[in-house]
Structure formats: structure tokens, C-alpha cells
Amino acid sequence: MKALKIHGAGHMTTEQVPVPEPGVGEVRVRMQYGGICGSDLHYFFEGRNGEFEVLEPFTPGHEMSGVVDLDPSGRLAAGTPVAIAPATYGTPEAGIEDRRHLWPGGTYFGSASTRPHTQGGMQEYRVVQDFMIRPLPEGLATDAAALAEPLAVALHALRMAGGVAGRTVLVTGCGPIGLCVAAACAAQGAARVDATDALEGPLDRARSVGAATTYRAGVDDVPATAYDTVFECSGAAPAVSQALRSVRRAGTVAQVGMLPDQPVGVNLAPFVSKEVTFTGCFRFDDEIDEAIELLAAHPEIARVITHVIPADRVQEAFDIARDSQQSGKVVVSLWLDS
């Protein structure tokens, strides 16, 4: 079978590897679609994602969907369309028993955080543990289902912020995660969703998924002390300062975008003087089930996907995904004609 392999910065190949055999408690999935995440971009273009360096060839991809190929238990028929929950969980820790995604020792598809690295899903077949399988509801196509994982990240952020129904919301940073956050807020009854970004392309896409008013960062004046909840999705220090400036007194800022693992210059004065609740948001726990339901109920969320590109043009796919002016979520189709 074919599999994409990242060897280091700028070096990715398509290789022939053996078709894996599922064991007890496992299912073999014919992978069909994989979304390109920011971590995939870091691994390919830089050879590392933060502190996690590519030290051996590994397959990227954790935003995955496909169809069941073989379930030895007989529970799932071949051809059943599914999305994949890409995490395994580590050892429970006191105080976070209800936050499995924070337990130490877990793994995540397509990650160099462990050695050996955890292989991802951008290959023709992938054996997964049966608890990772999420059958899709009727009418939800597997290409759109590649959004289940990033939408779950967005829904986890909404949960961490205490929900958005009836609230005014600002989203800073309209890359794929920011777009998923904006779409989720609109679908879940926010009174108003506004958005900021440094580029016009992402703002166009934000309006297409429910943003009412958009602001060019560094060009337009963004309202101050105006929003019940701000979701900071860029991971840029100036946007963190903007989020704290724009949130109302006693409001909530949810930090969704990953920040660099080093000191950054952020104006924290509003955090103190307005008694802002500032919460971090990391991956998700069980929100992927809600994400799948939301995708089925709100097909407009699939507008977050701007490109579907065959795996034989994967270099082009990664180049487009890196260009946030022209692309939202870029999805790779995995040799569907083979």
C-alpha cells in the first residue's frame, strides 16, 4: 500500500509499505481523506513541531476519515463510513480524572512527540483501536468528515469558555481552527460573531461561516471592552493583547492558538483591571461525537474546506495549506482511484 512519509524538513516521499493486519480490538480502515493541520506543516517545512523533532520517517495526518475495510469482530461492515478519533489516553492523574486528553503518556496520530513516532493516517490503510472509530450519520460524506477533528477542537474551546449561546463573540485569527470556532459559535446560538485577521482571504471565509463583522488586524479599529467571549486562535502575541483589550469586564478569553514555548510580549493590564477569565484550550476530550453531529446538522460548516487535492500532488497541497491568504482547510484525498 502507499503511505506518505516525512523524513525531515522539506523531505516527504510516497512509499510502499505492507498492508497492516488488525488484531483483537482493532479495525482496519481504508483511509480516504486527511486534513492538513498546522502541526503537519511544521513537521514538513521545519522538521519539527515545537519541541518535537522528526527523528525517523513517519506518516502525518490526524484529521482523518474513510471506510471500514476489515473489522475482525464483525461489528462493523466493510464500507461503513467513519471518522477517526486520533488519541489514546495515558495514565490518570489526580485532579484531572475527567480530562483524559491531559493525562500523561497518551499518543496522537501523526505525532513526533513519542519515540518511536506515532504514525498518522495519510496512508491507504491504517489499523486503529476500535474505540477510535466513529461511524458517520447518513448524509455526512467522508470528505466533510475530515473536519470532525478540528471542529472537535473548536467545540472543546467553546466548552472551556462556558458556552456561547446568547453571547457576543470575537474570534482572533481565521485559519482553519478559527473558522471552525466561528462556525461552531454561529451554529450554537451566539448572539453575534465577529472576527479579526491580518489578511482579507481568511476574513472572507469567516463571513461565509457566520461572522457578522470582520476587522483587518493592524488596519481597522477593533472594538474595545465589547465582547462577552474572545477566542484567540492565531497564537500571535499581538492578538492575545487584542483579545484582552476587546473582551468586556469580567469576560472570558479562551486561548486556542498554540503559543511559542518562550516568553512573549503581551499586555496583561486589561487581564487584571477587567478581571478577565483567561483559559487555555488543548485538543479535545469527547467532543468529536458532537462535532460529527454538528457537521451533519449544519452542512455549511464544510465551507471551511477550500481545497481537496490528491495525494499524488501532496507537495502542492502543503504549499497551498501554508498560504492562508488563499486557503482555509486543505484536505488530501488518499489514492481514491486505487
Give each language-model segment a name:
Residues 63, 80-81, 102, 125, ...:
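Residue-level marker of beta-strand positions
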Residues 5-21, 38-65, 83-88, 103-117:
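N-terminal glycine-rich cofactor-binding segment
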Residues 1, 285-338:
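C-terminal hydrophobic helical "lid"/dimerization subdomain
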Residues 252, 265-304:
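Rossmann-fold dehydrogenase core element
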Residues 79, 131, 137-219:
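Mid-domain Rossmann-like dinucleotide-binding core that forms the NAD(H)/NADP(H) cofactor-binding site
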Residues 198-199, 259, 284:
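Residues in the short beta-alpha loop(s) of Rossmann-like NAD(P)-binding domains
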Residues 20-34, 48-96, 137-139:
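Glycine-rich beta-strand-centered segment in the early N-terminal region that forms part
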Residues 161-162, 203-277, 337:
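Glycine-rich cofactor phosphate-binding loops and adjacent beta1-alpha1 units
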